[in-house]
Regions:
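Accessory cap/linker subdomain of secreted extracellular hydrolases
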Residues: 45, 49-77, 140, 192, ...
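C-terminal motif of bacterial Sec signal peptides marking the signal peptidase cleavage site
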Residues: 22-25
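Short beta-strand/loop motif that positions the catalytic acidic residue
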Residues: 290, 296-298
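Short substrate-entry loop that stabilizes the transition state in hydrolases
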Residues: 109-115, 120-155, 303-306
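N-terminal cap/lid segment of alpha/beta-hydrolase-fold proteins
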Residues: 69-113, 469-471
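Short alpha-helix in the alpha/beta-hydrolase fold that links the catalytic acid
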Residues: 305-314
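C-terminal, loop-rich substrate-recognition/catalytic regions characterized by aromatic stacking residues
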Residues: 58-60, 340-582
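Gly/Ser-rich "nucleophile elbow"/oxyanion-hole loop immediately N-terminal to the catalytic nucleophile
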Residues: 108-114, 161-166, 173-195
Length: 582
């Protein structure tokens, strides 16, 4: 049965979005969760903003009833009496905005001694209590640790600035406060955060000379590319960001306005300028000139801050650096460390700070510069760098389908001059699945999205398939589909799904990519779709396949009208599938 893409979009996207909000709101009532996880999650719920703005800064969530006891249990295992905690910090930014913070310090500070310091920046929709467990761990090791809520979140004042100039000013004010009020070693200050905090950390280490190093987890390099990569709005994650921002913070109206512009493909130049100011990629030259070291963790199934833009950002850096690419959706590979659980990413983060801020030769710089975790929670592979000398691009040629056969993925060039036409207006069985849910199942529970490609609608989609592979195909990085297309309306969305097809004929979704066009009706245009990077071994004897269609629930379509999409096949301009592989 075919379901129109508008209906599918409403059902799948809406269900996933409200499930996400439901889980956020009632997670503390789940009787099956561990007490430690409950406490930590409860600590993250913003509140008491009115009390703060009225001057009662001490009435924080950390000091109230059941919330206080839950938060206490989250880091009680770390509380051995070796550190102190101050929950009444208020820092005034340059424009007078109140920034809420907390401070962990080693107990019995030695007069005149300076201490290495780490600043934690909250994730989107969370607050200064997000990192209480990591802060306690670091304080026990002799660090001063300050965590703060960015403006617009928690009990900090102001409107959410989305890593803009005001957020930079706030970070500088935090550094001023540390110097004036603590025994900070000003030559050994690090910064870290997850998601929103990661982006601000990368921006911070790039512009603030007082910050020596950064650890960024699930962050972004290019904000426009994250929200509008290949001219395609990230519908699901955009709605989550906007919804969570309104539910938990005080949103600057420009944020929703800009997302609306992306959905309508309006004033893209203006949104691009707004996003560039908030992108670490815009400050690469400054960071490279400073030589400051950076450790980055990113997740392969992060469809918000997708892995391709983080790989490109990492490749542009010439500073001492390390990159771990993990299985997981946005922030899921790192969240365990926030809850105090064993986590290799956080272990590396602690070692990174110990090496760069305390001079401890712990072997962190002897570890591989780049690691990729294999798809479906597999083992890690190591690479000497990125781009890697061990990875090359293998190119296949795409041959058009015929009346009775699907298209072919071949090692030899296409010799036929044929167009393959499909219609929009209906989804196919080629899909990323149910947003968030399918992504989590695949990345953490090894339950892949599958499709019997023989049943894919030839009216609404195209399949290309290879012969059985004679040897293992070790994918290490990006996959690129390159071709020529035209649309009867000039607008079109092209989604490319890459499958590992076993002997049973069922395709296992390995990765996908998307791109949209906005040209004149029937105008032929070159199009490249970069599929999300992945590490995966396709076994010998299996086949590889790709499916093309015009809708996926993760993304906003360029038009609600039905259009015809022509995919061109021309011997003089080959359509190709290029795979980065070992």
């Amino acid at each position: 049965m075919r379901i129109g893409f508008r209906t599918t979009s409403v059902l799948k996207t809406g269900a996933s979005f409200f499930l996400f909000l439901f889980l956020m709101s009632c997670g503390s009532e789940n009787e099956n969760s561990s007490q430690k996880n409950l406490a930590a999650l409860a600590a993250l719920i913003p509140g008491n903003s009115a009390a703060f703005l009225n001057g009662n800064a001490s009435a924080s969530p950390f000091q109230q009833g059941i919330t206080a006891s839950q938060i206490d249990s989250a880091f009680q295992a770390e509380n051995d009496g070796s550190f102190t905690f101050n929950d009444s910090i208020v820092i005034r930014s340059g424009d007078g905005t109140s920034i809420a913070a907390n401070l962990f310090q080693p107990k019995n500070l030695v007069s005149g001694q300076k201490y290495p310091t780490v600043i934690f920046v909250n994730s989107w929709a969370l607050n200064e209590y997000e990192y209480i467990v990591p802060a306690a761990k670091l304080a026990k090791k002799g660090y001063i640790v300050l965590s703060y809520s960015t403006r617009g979140f928690g009990i900090s004042g102001g409107l959410i600035n989305t890593a803009g100039i005001k957020d930079r000013q706030d970070l500088s004010a935090v550094l001023d406060w540390l110097r004036a009020n603590t025994q900070v070693d000003s030559s050994n200050i690090g910064i870290s955060g997850i998601s929103y905090g990661a982006g601000i950390s990368l921006i911070g280490v790039s512009f603030e000379p007082r910050i020596k190093t950064a650890v960024a987890m699930s962050g972004w390099g290019d904000l426009k590319r994250s929200l509008y990569g290949n001219d395609t709005p990230r519908l699901v994650w955009g709605l989550i960001l906007i919804g969570a921002g309104y539910f938990t913070g005080r949103m600057d109206p420009v944020i929703a306005d800009n997302f609306t512009k992306l959905l309508s493909h309006n004033d893209i130049a203006g949104v691009t300028a707004w996003a560039a100011e908030r992108s670490p990629a815009s400050l690469v030259s400054e960071l490279n000139a400073s030589g400051k070291p950076v450790y980055i963790s990113s997740n392969f199934e992060d469809f918000l801050f997708n892995p391709n833009q983080m790989l490109d950002y990492f490749a542009s850096l010439t500073v001492p650096k390390k990159l771990d690419m993990n299985e997981g959706i946005h922030a899921t590979a790192e969240i365990g460390g926030v809850l105090g659980l064993s986590n290799p990413i956080w272990d590396n983060a602690y070692d990174w700070f110990d090496f760069w801020l305390k001079g401890i030769n712990n072997g962190i710089m002897m570890k591989p510069t780049v690691t990729f975790q294999k798809r479906f929670n597999g083992p890690r592979v190591t690479l000497p760098s990125w781009p890697s000398s061990t990875v090359s691009e293998k190119t296949y040629y795409l041959k058009p389908r015929t009346l009775f056969t699907d298209g072919k993925i071949s090692s030899t060039q296409n010799t036929n001059n044929l167009n393959t036409g499909i219609l929009s207006g209906a989804d196919t069985i080629a899909t990323t699945g149910i947003p968030l849910i399918s992504d989590i199942l695949a990345s953490h529970l090894e339950v892949p999205v599958t499709a019997s490609l023989d049943w894919l609608s030839r009216i609404n989609g195209i399949v290309y398939e290879s012969n059985s592979l004679s040897s293992v195909l070790k994918i290490r990085g990006k996959i690129f589909w390159k071709g020529q297309v035209s649309s009867s309306l000039g607008k079109a969305n092209v989604n490319v799904y890459f499958y590992d097809v076993g002997s049973n004929g069922v395709g296992k979704l390995i990765t996908h990519g998307t791109a949209s066009i906005y040209v004149s009706a029937f105008e032929t245009t070159d199009l490249t779709v970069d599929l999300n990077a992945v590490a995966y071994d396709v076994p010998a004897g299996n086949r590889i396949a790709i499916a093309l269609d015009t809708f996926d629930p993760q993304y906003a379509p360029p038009t609600a009208l039905v259009y015809g999409l022509d995919v061109k096949h021309n011997p003089s301009k080959q359509s190709t599938l290029s795979i980065q592989s070992e």
